[in-house]
Amino acid sequence: MTAAQFTNVTVNAQATISYDGRCSSHTIMFEDGRHKTLGVILPCDNLVEHYHFSTNTSERIEITSGECEVKINGEEEFSYYRAGQSFVVEGNSGFNLRTEQIVQYICHLEG
């Protein structure tokens, strides 16, 4: 279930920006030590067919708006996800993501 807002958190004001500004995220830290990132991904186009993201720890990516296709390392096909859905990527892995619209997400760092 998507949270509309988070309370009692510290936010890293410096964004993580990749793909020439097409992808950006901010880390939020909870009092109990948990971390999440909140991010925005802009649509792919003729310059960027898909984005590739690497993971250091297990992550659950929750799509909060938009829709996209995701192919986790080792999978043969892309899978479709839309707002309200999520997917899990193991640590020390990665995934490709392609989209034709703006996607917003919450990355739950689970490792």
Curated annotation (Swiss-Prot):
Signal peptide: none annotated. It is an enzyme of class 2 (transferase). It catalyses: a purine D-ribonucleoside + phosphate = a purine nucleobase + alpha-D-ribose 1-phosphate; adenosine + phosphate = alpha-D-ribose 1-phosphate + adenine; cytidine + phosphate = cytosine + alpha-D-ribose 1-phosphate; guanosine + phosphate = alpha-D-ribose 1-phosphate + guanine. Keywords: Glycosyltransferase, Transferase. InterPro entries: Ppnp (IPR009664), RmlC-like_jellyroll (IPR014710), RmlC_Cupin_sf (IPR011051). One of its GO terms (cellular component) is cytosol. Its EC number is 2.4.2.1, 2.4.2.2. Pfam families: Ppnp (PF06865). Belongs to the nucleoside phosphorylase PpnP family. PANTHER family: PYRIMIDINE/PURINE NUCLEOSIDE PHOSPHORYLASE, PYRIMIDINE_PURINE NUCLEOSIDE PHOSPHORYLASE. This is Pyrimidine/purine nucleoside phosphorylase 1. It comes from Psychrobacter cryohalolentis (strain ATCC BAA-1226 / DSM 17306 / VKM B-2378 / K5). The gene is ppnP1.
